[in-house]
Design a protein with these regions (language model features):
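Specific transmembrane alpha-helical segments of multi-pass solute transporters/efflux pumps
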Residues: 6, 10-11, 42-94, 130, ...
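Juxtamembrane helix-entry segments on the extracytoplasmic side of multipass membrane proteins
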Residues: 22-27, 31, 55-61, 133-156, ...
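Transmembrane alpha-helices of multi-pass small-molecule transport proteins
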Residues: 20-73, 100, 155-163, 177-196, ...
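Hydrophobic transmembrane alpha-helices of multi-pass small-molecule transport proteins
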Residues: 41, 45, 96, 113-134, ...
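Hydrophobic/aromatic residues within transmembrane alpha-helices
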Residues: 17, 29, 33, 81, ...
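Cytoplasmic-side transmembrane-helix entry/capping segments in multi-pass membrane proteins
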Residues: 58-65, 113-124, 171-180
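Glycine-/small-residue-enriched transmembrane alpha-helix faces in small-molecule transporters
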Residues: 1-28, 121, 139-166, 186-190, ...
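Helix-helix packing/entry segments at the starts of transmembrane helices
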Residues: 32, 71, 75, 89-96, ...
Length: 289
């Protein structure tokens, strides 16, 4: 439930912070929320639960890989893309992440795709294409770049989700989350420095959004996602893709007056329909085993 409700609102918070009037460079905003979030988690791990902070080298290796994919490429990519596209639009593109997970798992496991799987992918990917129809027609270069970054972020998140599920089972979700955000945050800080992002000059609203992202986005929701991946089947965890875009589109329209067009609604419907079809296909295969 935390993943459903909180993550849908983080797209709005990111947009408020990184838009021109917000004052936060996108990579600095993403990096700082990850670093502060990891610090809070490490304090909780040490002071309340009394756990050691050291990890085995193999475990740390997979945390480094997933941290860079999830937080640096995933969260950082969304933050950067939201300087070019609206919060609701970004959430809709990221809502197609379960399609990426399904494609990657089908390739890795060498499964022969069913007719339902193929049709669902075509519908879902068609929805993403329809969402970008106006930008392509109008040759909106900024939005097209934003979409490309979001697709890469989605692919990174999907890849990390699969690695997390297959290589990090049985370990502490809170410890995993802390290290992933620390490593991803450091990666973003290095990238921000290399790209020469300016010193932040955030507005009050941007600071409030940043605080929300640290506490609710990084400490609570991100950690809940890591925990859910260990406790639940992947296709159940990924059902957040049904809810997050709806919440994000509504909040973007309500707070920032982001435009919701017939293209938006039609494309969003196809994406969600495609995701539902993929989940039904995966659920049916699981039940037959």
């Amino acid at each position: 439930m935390v993943i459903y409700l909180v993550w849908g609102s983080t797209y709005l918070a990111i947009r408020i912070g990184v838009q021109d009037s917000g004052g936060f460079p996108p990579l600095i905003m993403a990096s700082s929320r990850g670093l502060v979030g990891s610090f809070i988690l490490f304090v909780l791990i040490k002071s309340i639960w009394g756990q050691r902070l050291t990890l085995e080298r193999t475990h740390l290796k997979f945390l480094a890989i997933t941290g860079l994919l999830l937080f640096m490429c995933g969260t950082g990519g969304v933050s950067f893309a939201e300087t070019m596209v609206g919060s609701g639009f970004a959430a809709l593109i990221i809502g197609g992440t379960p399609l990426m997970v399904a494609i990657i798992e089908t390739i890795i496991d060498r499964k022969y795709p069913s007719a339902l799987f193929i049709v669902s992918l075509i519908i879902g990917l068609g929805g993403i294409a329809i969402l970008n129809g106006p930008a392509i027609i109008l040759r909106d270069t900024a939005q097209i770049k934003g979409v490309a970054i979001l697709i890469l972020a989605s692919f990174s998140w999907a890849s990390a989700t699969i690695i997390q599920k297959r290589k990090l089972m049985g370990s502490s979700p809170i410890m995993n989350s802390a290290y992933q955000q620390l490593i991803g945050g450091c990666g973003l800080l290095i990238l921000s420095t290399a790209l020469g992002e300016p010193i932040p000059s955030p507005t009050t609203h941007a600071w409030i959004s940043w605080g929300f992202l640290v506490v609710f986005g990084s400490v609570i929701a991100f950690t809940s996602y890591v925990y859910a991946l260990q406790a639940l089947p992947t296709n159940i965890v990924m059902t957040y893709a049904y809810v997050n875009p709806i919440i994000a589109v509504y909040l973007g329209w309500l707070v920032l007056d982001e435009e919701v067009t017939a293209w938006t609604l039609f494309g969003a419907s196809l994406i969600i329909l495609g995701v539902i079809g993929v989940f039904r296909d995966q659920g049916g295969r699981t039940n037959k085993r």
